Amino acid sequence: MASLKDVKIKIAGVRKTKQITKAMNMVASAKLRGAQIKIEHFRPYAEKFQDVISNLATRSDETVHKLLEKRTNGTSCIFILITSDRGLCGIFNTMLIIKALELAKQKTTKGKKVSFICIGRKGRDAIKKTHYPILSDYSDKFTRDYQLASHISEKVIDGYLTVNMDEVVLIYGQFINAMRQIVGFSTLLPIHPKPLDKEQLEKYSEYIYEPGVAILLSELLPKFVTTQIYRGFLDTDASENAARMTAMDNATRNCDELIGNLTRLYNKTRQASITSELIDIVSGAEALK
């Protein structure tokens, strides 16, 4: 049985850990509120932007812009993987990495060459351990703002237009609510406009586009790609903080449980020590008779 001193040291250590996890939970909770506001305000804009692109695309064919053309004979594809730079957020990064590698394997089995653009240290470190090349790494010191999204957008669009590329896939953490985050993934290029329902088609039918649909698409499609990447940044940021808040809350609860178990062990050990001393005293008294 452990000594009283050892048990007390363990209890003190767990209490210090609890203080850390509780503080991290509070920090993650505060960051989540800000991140949640950002993504909830940005989503309506991104969705309306997609409606505009879909409306323009229905009034033209794929050949009007190369970013709309479906390709089947491409030899390569790029995966944009957005993860966190830091850990202690449960299985959040793991599920993103697993999904990315799963999708990459599907492409390689079809004879496609897969390469990665990594945003986030956790994703970068995981991909480094595989045979997939990393084209660009935006981890640690990079601020995930609209400017970075625009830079990445220009890079992948240039690659898509100049290289025999099949598609560009975006993988990110999709924020549902504080308790639920899932893996979000979508084909970034070629752009697949979502089908419009009858009501939407009638709504946009009387629109007159100047200077023309083709010119508008050439201006808006690159911005649409940037918007989708930036939305991935915001979604992942909110998901990361929500996952960390939940993980630290669970860790704090586990600390409470462990402190309870160790306290019971301490009391049991102390009682055993007292009983042993009483037995020694009684035995000594009996021996003196």
Curated annotation (Swiss-Prot):
The signal peptide, as residue positions, is none
One GO cellular component term = proton-transporting ATP synthase complex
Gene Ontology molecular function, alphabetical: ATP binding; proton-transporting ATP synthase activity, rotational mechanism
User: InterPro entries recorded for this chain?
Assistant: ATP_synth_F1_ATPase_gsu, ATP_synth_F1_gsu, ATP_synth_F1_gsu_CS
Report whether Ion transport shows up as a keyword of the record: yes
* Keywords (A to Z) from UniProt: ATP synthesis, Cell membrane, CF(1), Hydrogen ion transport, Ion transport, Membrane, Transport
Q: Where, per UniProt, does this protein localize?
A: Cell membrane
Topology within the bilayer: Peripheral membrane protein
> Which Gene Ontology biological process is one annotated for this entry?
proton motive force-driven plasma membrane ATP synthesis
Q: What does this protein do?
A: Produces ATP from ADP in the presence of a proton gradient across the membrane. The gamma chain is believed to be important in regulating ATPase activity and the flow of protons through the CF(0) complex.
Q: Which HAMAP family match?
A: ATP_synth_gamma_bact
Protein family according to the UniProt entry: Belongs to the ATPase gamma chain family.
- PANTHER family, per database record: ATP SYNTHASE GAMMA CHAIN, ATP SYNTHASE SUBUNIT GAMMA, MITOCHONDRIAL
- Partners and quaternary state? F-type ATPases have 2 components, CF(1) - the catalytic core - and CF(0) - the membrane proton channel. CF(1) has five subunits: alpha(3), beta(3), gamma(1), delta(1), epsilon(1). CF(0) has three main subunits: a, b and c.
Q: What is the name of the protein in this document?
A: ATP synthase gamma chain
Protein's organism: Lawsonia intracellularis (strain PHE/MN1-00)
